[in-house]
Amino acid sequence: MRKVLRVKKNIKIARIVPLVLLLVACGRGEVTAQSSSGWDQLVYLFARAIQWLSFDGSIGVGIILFTLTIRLMLMPLFNMQIKSSQKMQDIQPELRELQKKYAGKDTQTRMKLAEESQALYKKYGVNPYASLLPLLIQMPVMIALFQALTRVSFLKTGTFLWVELAQHDHLYLLPVLAAVFTFLSTWLTNLATKEKNVMMTVMIYVMPLMIFFMGFNLASGVVLYWTVSNAFQVVQLLLLNNPFKIIAERQRLANEEKERRLRERRARKKAMKRK
């Protein structure tokens, strides 16, 4: 019973923490050096870092360099999150079998399901919450970076290439690029997933559209951040968690298993003929 309660408690915490982070980060007022809250100070620190990286006063260059720096620092966590999610996907068929086996709602059945699920996680070296920790660490960092671009006045000035960073891109090239890289990152993330679900498939197309239309009205500095961040994620996925290689390896193992079973059947037939 304690194991069941512990699992339920962990699930509740996993749901509440992101909500709390979002509520803490939802301020819209201008952030300055005199801002007193800890969150606003973090936002201002990020803004000063972007300003420091703005060579020749180009805030656009600062946004790009700081975004790349943050993404590089978070890369190990992102990689951990992806690998953990893949492991969870791999054991989903066995988890569903357990859920069918222990479909009852009584306490004893739920306890047995929790025990065997934990045994399955241990067998494959899977921590069901390992994919949540990197996300919880990344979330406040990325929100603080976003707010630095929207709430600190000195980051809303200047130009980069053809755009005024405080205005929307009148050529709409940045929203298009942001949408394209958002699509590629979500598509590549979902590509190697063994079991597709409707929600993920919908998000592959909905997220880029949301980014595209939001980019029409948002400051170009924010859209530039989205573009660079998602472009980095595409490259990162191709280098560290290439879905095409994962699919090819999965197919190779499946073919080897098929060949092994075929050899076993042939060996059994030969043994039967000799008898």
From Swiss-Prot:
<dbReference type="Pfam" id="PF02096">
    <property type="entry name" value="60KD_IMP"/>
</dbReference>
<keyword id="KW-1003">Cell membrane</keyword>
<dbReference type="GO" id="GO:0051205">
    <property type="term" value="P:protein insertion into membrane"/>
</dbReference>
<feature type="transmembrane region" description="Helical">
    <location>
        <begin position="198"/>
        <end position="216"/>
    </location>
</feature>
<keyword id="KW-0472">Membrane</keyword>
<keyword id="KW-0449">Lipoprotein</keyword>
<feature type="lipid moiety-binding region" description="S-diacylglycerol cysteine">
    <location>
        <position position="26"/>
    </location>
</feature>
<dbReference type="InterPro" id="IPR023060">
    <property type="entry name" value="YidC/YidC1/YidC2_Firmicutes"/>
</dbReference>
<protein>
    <recommendedName>
        <fullName>Membrane protein insertase YidC 1</fullName>
    </recommendedName>
</protein>
<dbReference type="InterPro" id="IPR028055">
    <property type="entry name" value="YidC/Oxa/ALB_C"/>
</dbReference>
<feature type="lipid moiety-binding region" description="N-palmitoyl cysteine">
    <location>
        <position position="26"/>
    </location>
</feature>
<comment type="similarity">
    <text>Belongs to the OXA1/ALB3/YidC family. Type 2 subfamily.</text>
</comment>
<keyword id="KW-0564">Palmitate</keyword>
<feature type="transmembrane region" description="Helical">
    <location>
        <begin position="129"/>
        <end position="149"/>
    </location>
</feature>
<feature type="signal peptide">
    <location>
        <begin position="1"/>
        <end position="25"/>
    </location>
</feature>
<feature type="transmembrane region" description="Helical">
    <location>
        <begin position="171"/>
        <end position="191"/>
    </location>
</feature>
<feature type="transmembrane region" description="Helical">
    <location>
        <begin position="222"/>
        <end position="240"/>
    </location>
</feature>
<keyword id="KW-0812">Transmembrane</keyword>
<dbReference type="GO" id="GO:0005886">
    <property type="term" value="C:plasma membrane"/>
</dbReference>
<dbReference type="InterPro" id="IPR047196">
    <property type="entry name" value="YidC_ALB_C"/>
</dbReference>
<keyword id="KW-0732">Signal</keyword>
<keyword id="KW-1133">Transmembrane helix</keyword>
<dbReference type="GO" id="GO:0015031">
    <property type="term" value="P:protein transport"/>
</dbReference>
<keyword id="KW-0653">Protein transport</keyword>
<dbReference type="GO" id="GO:0032977">
    <property type="term" value="F:membrane insertase activity"/>
</dbReference>
<feature type="transmembrane region" description="Helical">
    <location>
        <begin position="58"/>
        <end position="78"/>
    </location>
</feature>
<dbReference type="InterPro" id="IPR001708">
    <property type="entry name" value="YidC/ALB3/OXA1/COX18"/>
</dbReference>
<comment type="function">
    <text>Required for the insertion and/or proper folding and/or complex formation of integral membrane proteins into the membrane. Involved in integration of membrane proteins that insert both dependently and independently of the Sec translocase complex, as well as at least some lipoproteins.</text>
</comment>
<keyword id="KW-0813">Transport</keyword>
<keyword id="KW-0143">Chaperone</keyword>
